Amino acid sequence: MAKSAELTWLDALEAEESGDREAALGAAKKTVRIDPTHSDGWMGVARWTLPPETRGRQDMPDLQQSAKAMAALRKVVEIDPENFAAWRLGGVLLVDHLGMLEDGIRWWEARRAVAPYEVTPLIEQIGILVRLGYYEECASL
């Protein structure tokens, strides 16, 4: 009998705890194959596709890692729009790692549609606009 998505997800968490990120990623991918709506599984795919954090900072992912992680993060926020960790990681990837500032503005605008009274998306958008030199546009947010 095949394992359920939840049991496979538990395998992913156990692999992560033991330090085996590759096995964790494999189990997370299997989880979302079993249940494509498993938002934790998609979040695991995103996190474990990226290089591990060292000293509290994310190492710079390559383009392929970033693309795979962003695809998974888009699934997470589609399934669970309240998952702020997915929004935050997506913003970091787009703006800090890929330099896709305009896409970062759209990413945070989508978050504002979900959580209109949350301050973080507004601050992130203002930060991006300042980096682009669009100071006057900051006032219209």
What are these model-derived regions, one by one?
Residues 13, 47, 92-93, 127:
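Residue-level recognition of tetratricopeptide repeat
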Residues 32, 77, 91, 95, ...:
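A conserved position within tetratricopeptide repeats
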